[in-house]
Amino acid sequence: MLFKKIKVTPKGVYVLDAELRNKIDKLKLSPSMIGNWLNSPADFILDKFIKPDVEVADVTHLKRGNWFHSTMEVFFGLPAEERTKENLLKVSKEVTLREDYRDFARDKENQEWYKRALKAYIGAWLPDAQKERIATLYIMGQSKPGLELFVNGKLGNAKRQCLGFIDKLIEGENGLKVQDWKTGKKISNYDPNLKISTSNPFDYWRQQTFYAMLLEQLGGTVEEASLLFPCAETPTIVHVDHQNPKVREQVIKDVEQVDRELDEAIKNDYFFPFKKGPYNSWASYLVGLGRAPKPNIREDKFAMLADLSEVGGKA
């Protein structure tokens, strides 16, 4: 048998490959990493380190989101008085001609999605664009504008670095406003009075509170944290109660839990357990946990990387 990178068991996945183990040793904690790990450690590992080599690429939703994000980053990089409809359309053409999006933009469905997203933004929030002042932060000896702003630090007692990119940071009357674009149709919100669940997801609140806490470490005062959904049926801004002590405690708890569980997995010979969940496609596909859709992969390529002898010999 050729050397395999991973071994799949009914309970989880062992990482065998030394290079992958080294990458896992160096993992840092971001909001998306934390959310994915809490859903299923094995699914997180497979998605991050194995799927890129075996997937049948279907990047439509991700690429559409990046296209819109890139447009907004350039648009809000303009001086406030130049943030007009005409200039937004000009920026959109410039971004679309980038190598990242040029071929993707030729698809009619993608074109229509992009037009709808821009139209929704223009109708809902363009009038505010000329009033918004993009914040400037002094980080690591440099002044940096609050667009796709990289922040890092430590939270709670976690040993690993906490980091991420903030889409947009603007000046409020009494501090900073942390904003994040969400380009899906579904509005996701959280009720802090109810238990975290699939129907009451904490991911987006965790993300914005996580960023607010890192900004506070850098000396910032965060006035507001929010999520902007331009592609929802009605464009909506969801405000996150980032100052709620229970919300902040939950963020710290999640950060520390993932940091601790990652240590335990490494000590346990790089073993990562499966968990059942509606989006845990690997757990469902490989060991029959739940009914999540099958991952879009080349099974022959996956079988070359994975020892599947304990789960029936083949996926």
Role assignments for model-derived ranges:
Residues 1-18, 23, 27, 36-38, ...:
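Nuclease-adjacent, charged terminal/linker segments that flank catalytic cores
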Residues 19-26, 42-55, 98, 186-194, ...:
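Short amphipathic alpha-helical segments and their helix-coil junctions
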Residues 27-81, 111-115, 148, 284:
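Nuclease catalytic cores
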Residues 45-51, 182-187, 228-239:
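Short acidic (Asp/Glu) and glycine-rich catalytic loops that position anionic groups and cofactors
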Residues 50, 72-80, 155, 170, ...:
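Hydrophobic/aromatic-lined pockets within catalytic cores
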Residues 67-149:
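A non-catalytic, helix-rich entry segment at domain boundaries
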Residues 140-141, 146-207, 218:
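Non-catalytic protein-protein interaction segments used by genome-maintenance enzymes to assemble
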